[in-house]
Each structure stands twice: as structure tokens, then as C-alpha cells.
């Protein structure tokens, strides 16, 4: 189980029920965290990225941002996560674990910077643009979009392009 979900499960079991009622009655600051495993942190304007993510999520029925953890890693780590949790034996750019509740997007997103780099070359785009596409791709999954079924990939790509347009026009 990804680390945030495991911590959440432990807290849920170990803290008294009144604590959770109190939390639900008061605004608790939600977080978007950027973490690394076995790789150097990419340069990001974290404040701008957080605002952009919140703006994109809000375009999907006014969804709010809960707790989002971006875990940047290498290909070896993402392959390990892919095998362990999804039973897939291949590299990918992002794996999203969804812990969302109605109206609030929350989750862990593992991003392989190695795959992002190779995809940027493959798709003739910059590393920065490809990274932003992958970052928002995870949020779009948390907002309910899929990319595996017939026609879903085109819908996802259009949503990514709208979100990237917001990013580059600073409309967030």
C-alpha cells in the first residue's frame, strides 16, 4: 500500500472517533506535497503548480484539492510500484492511487522522471512541458477521467491540452 494510504489507515484506526468528527466540522489545511525517491527533485514553481492544480480540479464540478502527494522517482522504482500494486511488468510515466472523496481530490502519484524524459524526446516536446502534462494527468484521473477505454484517450488528451493551456496562459 502506498505510504500515505498506510499512514491514513493507521491514523483512522488509532485516533478516537470524535477527532474525525471535529476534523470534518472544521476546515483543515489540505496539502499538495512534492517528494522524491532515488532521484533529484525537478525544478518546479511549487506555488504556481499548486494554484494551477486547484484551478484545474475546480473545473470538474467545483472539486476541491485534498491531500495530493507527488512522488518523483526513477524507472526502477516505478516498475517496482507497478508490479507490486497493479501487477504490471512495464515502465510508465505515472501511477495514480486515488483516495478521493466526493468533491475532493486526494491521492498519491508516482512519476518516473526517466520515462518523462524519454517521452519528451519521443513526442518532440520539452522535458518541462511533458512533466506538466504528466502532473496534470494524475489530477485528471482523480477527477474521474480515464484513458484506457475506447474514446477515453482522446477525452483525456483534450483535457490535458486545456489544462496545459491554462498553465501557459497563467489562467489559474
Where are these regions (language model features)?
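An acidic/histidine-cluster motif and surrounding catalytic segment
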Residues: 2, 6-131, 143-172
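Short active-site segment of divalent metal-dependent hydrolases/proteases
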Residues: 136, 140-144
Amino acid at each position: 500500500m502506498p505510504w500515505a494510504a498506510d499512514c491514513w489507515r493507521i491514523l483512522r484506526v488509532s485516533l478516537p472517533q470524535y477527532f474525525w468528527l471535529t476534523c470534518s466540522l472544521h476546515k483543515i489545511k489540505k496539502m499538495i506535497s512534492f517528494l522524491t525517491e532515488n532521484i533529484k527533485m525537478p525544478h518546479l514553481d511549487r506555488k504556481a503548480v499548486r494554484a494551477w492544480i486547484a484551478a484545474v480540479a475546480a473545473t470538474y464540478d467545483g472539486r476541491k484539492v485534498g491531500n495530493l502527494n507527488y512522488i518523483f522517482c526513477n524507472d526502477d522504482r516505478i516498475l517496482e510500484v507497478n508490479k507490486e500494486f497493479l501487477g504490471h511488468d512495464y515502465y510508465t510515466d505515472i501511477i495514480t492511487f486515488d483516495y478521493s472523496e466526493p468533491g475532493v481530490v486526494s491521492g498519491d502519484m508516482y512519476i518516473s522522471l526517466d520515462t518523462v524524459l524519454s517521452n519528451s524526446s519521443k513526442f518532440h516536446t520539452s522535458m518541462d512541458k511533458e512533466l506538466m502534462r504528466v502532473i496534470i494527468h494524475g489530477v485528471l484521473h482523480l477527477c474521474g477521467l480515464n484513458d484506457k477505454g475506447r474514446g477515453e484517450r482522446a477525452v483525456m488528451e483534450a483535457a490535458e491540452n486545456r489544462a496545459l493551456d491554462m498553465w501557459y496562459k497563467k489562467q489559474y
